[in-house]
C-alpha cells in the first residue's frame, strides 16, 4: 500500500514539475533549478547581495543560487559554495564538495573564507524527504541549525543570512535563536515556492554576535 502511495506521489510531483512555469522559465534562462527564482525574489525584496561582497552558499548543488549570487557580487566579489553532492563548475564560484560537518571539509571551507569573514550566508538545504513528518522535520531543523552555526563561524558584523526553514516542530525555537543573533528577521514565502510546501525563508540582517 505504501509503495503505491509513494508511486502516486512521485507521479504527481513529476507532472507538477514538468508543467511548472518556473521550471520552464529556468530552462529558458539557462538556470540550473527553479530555486534560483526564490533567491531572485528575496534579493528583490531585501537587497541581500551587492557587488564586491563575499557569499557562502550552503547546500549549493545543482547551483541555482550560486548562479544568481555570482552575477550579483560581480568581478570584485566572491562566492564560495559547498555541498555533499557534486556540482558542475560555474565561472566565478569556488565550489567545495563535502560534508562541512566533517573537520577536514570545514577547515577547507574556512580556509577559502579567509580572515576577512563573509557578508552573506545562504542556505537552501533540505533533507531527503521520507514522507514522515516525525523523521523529516527533525532532519530539516538539524540542517538549519548547522547553517546558523556556520554564521557564527564566518559571518562578519552586520552580515546577512537567508535560510530555508520548514514550518513545524522546532520552528519557533529556531526563529528565536535567529532573532537573538540578528537585528532584523523577516519571514518570506516567495511566489516561486510551491503553495503546498511548508517551506518559508528567513531573511536575517544585521548580524550582532
From Swiss-Prot:
A GO term from the CC aspect: cytoplasm
Enzyme class: transferase
Residues reported in the UniProt entry to bind S-adenosyl-L-methionine: 63, 65, 83, 99, 124
Molecular-function GO term, any one: rRNA (uridine-2'-O-)-methyltransferase activity
Superkingdom of the source species: Bacteria
Protein keywords: Cytoplasm, Methyltransferase, rRNA processing, S-adenosyl-L-methionine, Transferase
Primary subcellular site in the record, as a coarse category: cytoplasm
Subcellular location: Cytoplasm
EC number(s) given by UniProt: 2.1.1.166
InterPro entries for the chain: RNA_methyltr_RlmE, RNA_MeTrfase_FtsJ_dom, rRNA-MeTfrase_E, SAM-dependent_MTases_sf
Pfam families registered for this protein in UniProt: FtsJ
TM annotation in the entry: none
Catalytic machinery residues: 164
Catalytic reaction list: uridine(2552) in 23S rRNA + S-adenosyl-L-methionine = 2'-O-methyluridine(2552) in 23S rRNA + S-adenosyl-L-homocysteine + H(+)
Role noted for this protein: Specifically methylates the uridine in position 2552 of 23S rRNA at the 2'-O position of the ribose in the fully assembled 50S ribosomal subunit.
Family of this protein: Belongs to the class I-like SAM-binding methyltransferase superfamily. RNA methyltransferase RlmE family.
Protein's name according to its UniProt entry: Ribosomal RNA large subunit methyltransferase E
